[in-house]
Amino acid sequence: MENNNEEFRTDILKGLSNPIQKSIPSKYLYDSKGSYLFEQITVQPEYYPTRTENSILEEYSTNILHNISKEIILIEMGSGSSKKTKHLFDSILKKQDKLYYFPIDISFNFLDSVVNDLETKNQNIRVKGIPNDYINGIKDCNNILFENNFKFDSFSRLIVFFGSSIGNFEIDEARDFLKAVRMNMNDKDFLLVGFDMIKDEFLMEHAYNDKAGFTAQFNLNILSRMNRELGCNFDLSEYIHSAFFNKKEDRIEMHLKSKSDQEFIISGCDRIFKISQGETIHTERSYKYSIEKIQELAIRSGFTLEEIFSDKNNWFNLVMLKPC
């Protein structure tokens, strides 16, 4: 925990010291409470990505698997509650008697509850939760398979990355991330990635400003976490949630906007931080994609684009990639 907190502290100091735009890495939004709040966001009527992606999986889960001839081992990056993955569970178990499933998530407590629930309800699914970041989590999965004498030429790993999480990366970061995933795959493996597509601006902005206020709570929770874990003294009532579409960058941006001129501290740091009225802390971005940008990203990352599965409105795409 000390090492994790030290990394947390270092990242926060770097982000909040930027004179052009204060920022906080979005991965720190997902502590146990943040993960819970995000699950609440996904069921709000304004938040189209989850239900749209779920409808694609419900309709096409069998088709998604049709090019995979070998036994499937399923690895999910950022598994959350694994609700959407159920459609793949059902389709995979029509092809094979049992399934080895490795959910990877940075929230250990949230992951633990999901694993226990899955093991209770699905006798044919062997679940091993991996509490780690995505790339190290995939490496952990590969090590577990190797240590348990799995023959890598006898099965295909299907790695899934749902929820348009790829959009939380800067474009170059997304390329580097997919390259790192590619380095841990072989030519029998597949990668299924969710992409939120560019669409009506109002629809996109509405999804990140739900009436129930869960997205605002989710955003503000990072300040609570910093108060608790880093000894900060943020007054949450002096910040408001802001989310909007940046047309130039093709992305939704989430910010915390200061209501007044303020000062705050970080325990163990010998400086006082200042933030002006109207100034923001950038907490998350979500890039929206076109087909052309998806194709370019795949090629630059070392993948071939095998197939695209979309909803009737083309709001969301599930893209099957294969190492080349």
Where are these regions (language model features)?
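A short glycine-rich, Lys/Arg-flanked "PGG" loop and its adjoining helix->strand segment in the class I
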Residues: 175-187
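Class I SAM-dependent methyltransferase Rossmann-like catalytic core
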Residues: 21-67
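Conserved class I S-adenosyl-L-methionine
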Residues: 71-80
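Substrate-binding/catalytic lobe of Class I Rossmann-like enzymes that use SAM or dcSAM, i.e.
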Residues: 205-287, 295-301
